Amino acid sequence: MASLIRLSSVWQRGMRPVLLCHTQLSRGSACPRIGDVDYTEPAGRIHTASSSTGISASQHWTGERVMTLVLLGMAPAAYLCPGPVVDYSIAAALTMHGHWGIGQVLTDYVHGEVKIKLAKVGIFLLSTATFFGLCYFNYNDVGLCKAVVMLWQK
């Protein structure tokens, strides 16, 4: 009842409730427009994981999201048609996804020039070892798809 009294007081003042409006609210964008960004700011203050690759941060972010969607699509593919192509694709996609994810954590929490360089070398070595380990497993054992099936069997 109190909410009805409150709504009636709002309507008396000439305002329409937001939920009953048929027009969309027009707010300012949370992101600046393309022409409003100052690209002359020193890059030392901006932490982007893609600074070494030469692509913009938005393209890098888009690539990460595409890779996440590809991984989601690989789950049914691995179940429906397991094989070497899917095994090696999953190995590559998991390695890239993990590399980018841990790289973002390192970007956020590792500070100092020497520590950042050591962290980048470490993540590169870890990602390389992960990829070659998964490829070794795919080549010399049953493969990732069949290994997951074996884990879920009784």
UniProtKB/Swiss-Prot annotation:
Binding site for heme b: H97
A single cellular component GO annotation: mitochondrial inner membrane
Coiled-coil positions: none
This protein's UniProt keywords: Electron transport, Heme, Iron, Membrane, Metal-binding, Mitochondrion, Mitochondrion inner membrane, Transit peptide, Transmembrane, Transmembrane helix, Transport, Tricarboxylic acid cycle
Mitochondrial intermembrane side: 81-85, 138-154
UniProt subunit comment: Component of complex II composed of four subunits: the flavoprotein (FP) SDHA, iron-sulfur protein (IP) SDHB, and a cytochrome b560 composed of SDHC and SDHD.
PANTHER family per UniProt: SUCCINATE DEHYDROGENASE, SUCCINATE DEHYDROGENASE [UBIQUINONE] CYTOCHROME B SMALL SUBUNIT, MITOCHONDRIAL
Protein name: Succinate dehydrogenase [ubiquinone] cytochrome b small subunit A, mitochondrial
Organism this protein belongs to: Danio rerio
Lineage: Eukaryota, Metazoa, Chordata, Craniata, Vertebrata
